[in-house]
Amino acid sequence: MFAEFGVLNFWTYVVGAFFIVLVPGPNTLFVLKTGIGHGVKKGYLAATGVFIGDAVLMFLAWAGVAALIQTTPVLFNIVRYLGALYLLWLGGKMLWSVIMRKNSAHAGGAEPSSTILKRSLVLSLTNPKAILFYVSFFVQFIDVSATNTGTSFLILATTLELISFMYMSFLIFSGAFVTRYLKTKKKLAKLGNGLIGLLFVGFAARLASLH
């Protein structure tokens, strides 16, 4: 399928992309958190930021920016540390709200839509490993002798975004379901927010330690 467009082993790619999307990360965690704290509509808003960020990174990978980042350690480190600091800030903010007894699932209901979109977009764009991953993963399924590899890249990118959309939808509706349960379980809600905050801090440490 899509072999005429320079795509190799498409269904193998789909299976690989599916399992890659399932790997927990700051983006999926933020979408789940938003779904729990703000409902379906804002959950999809957070997911939109992730989709836009991933689309930008995939385009940059195709345009050759990945090679520039890979061969320029200073540029790689700048993006890496900015991403780590941002994750640390998000995690610290959540932990502080738990300490101050502010349940984000209730008190955070008035958070502006623009803030949610910006946060999810920044989370996607400040991960230098993502753009390098797109190149290393996509190249395995592109026929380099094809007339237009841009079309091949577009097919693979669109497929990945569709798989991501389905998984994000599952997270968002799961989050909305959890919200209804947590309305009567305030201590459990605080514990959940604290754990998510700690996970963000952990993601920050992992990103900062990447080489």
Swiss-Prot record:
Protein name as it appears in the record: Leucine efflux protein
UniProt keyword annotation of Membrane present: yes
Compartment(s) where it occurs, according to its Swiss-Prot or TrEMBL record: Cell inner membrane
Membrane topology: Multi-pass membrane protein
Cellular component aspect of the GO annotation: plasma membrane
Membrane-spanning parts: 5-25, 49-69, 72-92, 122-142, 153-173, 191-211
Gene Ontology MF, one: antiporter activity
Protein function: Exporter of leucine.
Top-level lineage group: Bacteria
GO process terms (BP): L-leucine transport
UniProt record similarity statement: Belongs to the Rht family.
Enzymatic reactions: L-leucine(in) + H(+)(out) = L-leucine(out) + H(+)(in)
Main location: membrane
A Pfam match: LysE
